[in-house]
């Protein structure tokens, strides 16, 4: 515990000691087969050295390594890998309550990276993190995704990398406000993947300065960014898509839409650098 200097044998003991307080838990280098449930307070989970605190294979409540339902949570420098649970939604992080910031972290070879849904004005920020080998449509009744988040607040994803998807979408959001900027989506080694970004129920904000490289082994190749495919809960008016780069694999043989809109709100599509064969817009 950074504030007190007290050490704990396992992570959950440290978390439970905080109760409704505020604390930073410093996690020493190592491979941990542990998980924890945060039920209150404001907790920062921080690796002493980024990338050296590795949580491998253990999920609490059949959900995730970190099940977060406190006042707020920060996850900094942690690696989550090999998370699988019977319902197909095994995640590094399950956010159920409270604002969440994730930075400098890695989510590897699991059913899901970050999963959460709550009917509040929650703010989620994900930055400088890696999502690889995630997603499945084989283990779950519904597909699992690298990131799958729903709230009535906002989601920001920036300076992060998505690669080697194993099913589902790379980013699936059901939120009114979003910012997805300066990320890399590399599907070249993906398999059974779908959209890069699925804004299932609409939403507005900014998608800018991302690089998208489509791969040859997609389950659904028809769009990179798809808006309101499942409903029009949130307005997409003014959603700005600008300054992105998108490419196709050699001899792809398909012509996907860069942005496909199932809703009726006007999306603001600016200048994007699209490889031959990619259609800028499709109204569905």
Where do the protein language model's features map onto the residues?
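Leucine-rich solenoid repeat scaffolds
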Residues: 253-284
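Right-handed parallel beta-helix
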Residues: 28, 42, 46-53, 71-82, ...
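Extracytoplasmic/periplasmic, Sec-exported soluble proteins
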Residues: 6, 67-70, 94, 202, ...
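Extracellular beta-strand/beta-solenoid scaffold signature
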Residues: 57-66, 86-94, 109-118, 138-150, ...
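Acidic Gly/Asp/Thr-rich repetitive segments characteristic of extracellular carbohydrate-active
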Residues: 1-28, 33
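Extracellular beta-strand-rich solenoid/capping regions of secreted or surface-exposed proteins
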Residues: 16, 20, 32-46, 54-76, ...
């Amino acid at each position: 515990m950074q504030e007190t200097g007290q050490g704990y044998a396992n992570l959950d003991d440290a978390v439970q000691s905080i109760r409704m307080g505020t604390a930073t838990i410093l996690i020493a280098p190592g491979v941990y087969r542990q998980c924890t449930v945060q039920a209150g307070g404001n907790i920062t989970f921080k690796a002493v050295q980024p990338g050296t605190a590795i949580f491998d294979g253990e999920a609490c409540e059949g959900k995730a390594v970190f099940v977060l339902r406190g006042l707020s949570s920060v996850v900094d420098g942690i690696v989550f890998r090999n998370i699988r649970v019977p319902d197909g939604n095994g995640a590094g992080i399950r956010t159920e309550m409270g604002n969440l910031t994730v930075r400098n972290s890695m989510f590897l070879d699991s059913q899901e990276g970050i999963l959460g849904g709550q009917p509040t004005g929650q703010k989620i920020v994900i930055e400088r993190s890696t999502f690889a080998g995630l997603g499945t449509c084989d283990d779950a009744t519904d597909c699992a995704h690298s990131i799958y988040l729903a709230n009535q607040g906002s989601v920001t994803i920036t300076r992060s990398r998505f690669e080697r998807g194993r099913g589902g979408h790379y980013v699936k959001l059901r939120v009114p406000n979003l910012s997805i900027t300066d990320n890399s989506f590399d599907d070249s080694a993906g398999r059974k993947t779908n959209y890069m970004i699925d804004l299932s129920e609409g939403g507005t904000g900014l998608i800018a300065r991302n690089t998208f490289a489509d791969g040859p082994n997609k389950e659904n190749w028809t769009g990179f960014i798809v808006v309101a495919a499942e409903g029009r809960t949130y307005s997409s008016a003014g959603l700005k898509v600008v300054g992105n780069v998108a490419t196709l694999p050699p001899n792809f043989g398909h012509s996907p839409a860069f942005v496909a809109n199932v809703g009726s709100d006007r999306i603001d599509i600016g200048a994007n650098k699209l490889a031959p064969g990619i259609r800028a817009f499709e109204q569905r």
